[in-house]
């Protein structure tokens, strides 16, 4: 790792901010008013925003309904009358203001990537993992209800320009090692606060060797290192992905060759091993073999970090012809309906069901720890979810380990934490 004083306005994320702020350049530490390209809110907090809209602002005009996206994914379908009321409020508001609403279609960030995100856009979402969109070369960042409400009625928001930490990725991941292992390893290296209010930029030939699903994994977990967002330099793979979905791949910003970053890390991908984050800190990352033989009660494959078709293929390959341990509940939640249908077409769902796994509907599911698959006192879960703090997936006296889709699946078969090799 090298540490240097950062030179201004050569770095990709600042070019995105400058575009949104309608200025020629921006500098780290400056505060700018920006035009938001897109706003996303899910059922976790949208009802609170709607209450503020009615009670505090007295029904102002929405700036641009076409920039707004509402997605129900955290508690879908509703698990109690309170959630049902919040969902009804969300539906009614979306209908009244002609806002695009997705219900039961998948996890919010997957829906956004499939249908809305374009390179170079400045996107805000009322969810901390909005940083996912950096995989397509966008600037995605999470905000709270108050900031969301302001942006909804004005079309604008503000940003304190961050410094940037660059992660140069070299080579390719070895067989049996995945982007999930890479990002958990990075978080273990820098710490959960190691990139506080920084941009995590992933670059180098190693980054370009990753497919879109793998890049989504990296950027999605950037916030778990404290980052403002994560971003991968857009390339031909991004252009192909975006244009194949009928969107334009414009504003393909790249950092200048002579850009200087606050820090630069060089990571050899062929040195990454299967890892696990132990309870109750995501940066307590160890070689998966160090926690081998830890008995588990539940395994989960899904969330906005995993649950895409690539992860489901990995799981199906491991599960084919095998059975989930009688002592384990293995829950699988495809990230979206599109992913679910593709998994059906490829025969993956058949493999899951025949193995004894339970295939859930497309939502946040176990990761959210609110409506499906919650774990009880003293129970142990291994998960592809995003967090493992106390009580994240159920009882505060339960234990959550985080691993890759391969490690989670192999563990579900063995009844204890193990790797797929």
Model-assigned labels for residue ranges:
Residues 1-7, 11:
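Single conserved hydrophobic/aromatic residue that forms the stacking wall/gate
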Residues 21, 26-31, 62-68, 96-99, ...:
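Short coil/turn connectors at secondary-structure junctions
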Residues 52-61, 90, 94, 146-158, ...:
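Structured alpha-helical segments in the cores of large, soluble enzyme domains
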Residues 126-239, 243, 374-376, 380-421:
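Mobile "lid/hinge" segments at catalytic clefts and subdomain interfaces of large enzymes
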Residues 349-370, 386-388, 405, 416-419:
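Phosphate/diphosphate-binding loops
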């Amino acid at each position: 790792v090298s540490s240097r004083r950062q030179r201004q306005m050569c770095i990709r994320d600042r070019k995105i901010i400058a575009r949104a702020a309608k200025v020629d350049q921006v500098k780290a530490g400056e505060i700018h008013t920006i035009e938001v390209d897109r706003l996303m809110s899910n059922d976790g907090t949208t009802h609170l925003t709607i209450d503020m809209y009615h009670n505090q602002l007295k029904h102002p005009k929405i700036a641009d309904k076409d920039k707004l996206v509402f997605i129900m994914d955290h508690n879908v379908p509703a698990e109690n009358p309170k959630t049902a009321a919040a969902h009804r409020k969300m539906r009614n508001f979306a209908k009244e203001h002609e806002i695009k609403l997705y219900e039961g279609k998948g996890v919010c960030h997957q829906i956004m990537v499939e249908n809305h995100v374009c390179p170079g856009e400045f996107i805000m979402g009322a969810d901390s993992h909005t940083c996912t969109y950096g995989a397509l070369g966008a600037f995605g960042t999470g905000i709270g209800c108050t900031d969301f409400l302001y942006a909804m009625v004005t079309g604008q928001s503000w940003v304190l320009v961050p410094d940037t930490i660059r992660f140069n990725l070299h080579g390719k991941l070895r067989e049996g090692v995945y982007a999930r292992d890479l990002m958990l390893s990075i978080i273990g290296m820098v710490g959960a606060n190691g990139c506080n209010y920084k941009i995590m930029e992933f670059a180098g030939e190693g980054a370009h060797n990753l497919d879109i699903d793998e890049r989504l994994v990296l950027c999605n977990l950037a916030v778990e290192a404290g980052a403002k967002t994560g971003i991968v330099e857009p390339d031909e793979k991004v252009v192909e992905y975006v244009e194949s979905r009928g969107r334009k791949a414009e504003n393909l910003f790249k950092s200048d060759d002579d850009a200087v970053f606050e820090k630069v890390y060089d990571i050899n991908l062929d040195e990454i091993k299967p890892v696990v984050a132990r309870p109750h800190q995501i940066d307590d990352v160890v070689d998966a073999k160090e926690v081998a033989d830890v008995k588990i009660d539940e395994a989960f494959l899904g969330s906005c970090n995993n649950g895409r078709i690539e992860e489901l293929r990995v799981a199906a390959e491991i599960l084919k012809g095998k059975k989930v341990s009688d002592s384990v509940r293995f829950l699988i939640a495809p990230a979206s309906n599109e992913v679910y249908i593709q998994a059906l077409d490829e025969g993956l769902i058949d493999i899951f069901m025949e193995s004894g796994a339970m295939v859930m509907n497309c939502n946040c599911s176990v990761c959210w720890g609110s409506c499906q698959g919650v774990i009880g006192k003293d129970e142990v879960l291994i998960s592809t979810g995003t967090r493992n703090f106390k009580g994240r997936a159920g009882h505060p006296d339960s234990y959550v380990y985080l691993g890759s889709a391969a490690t989670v699946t192999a563990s579900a078969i063995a009844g204890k934490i193990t790797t797929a090799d």
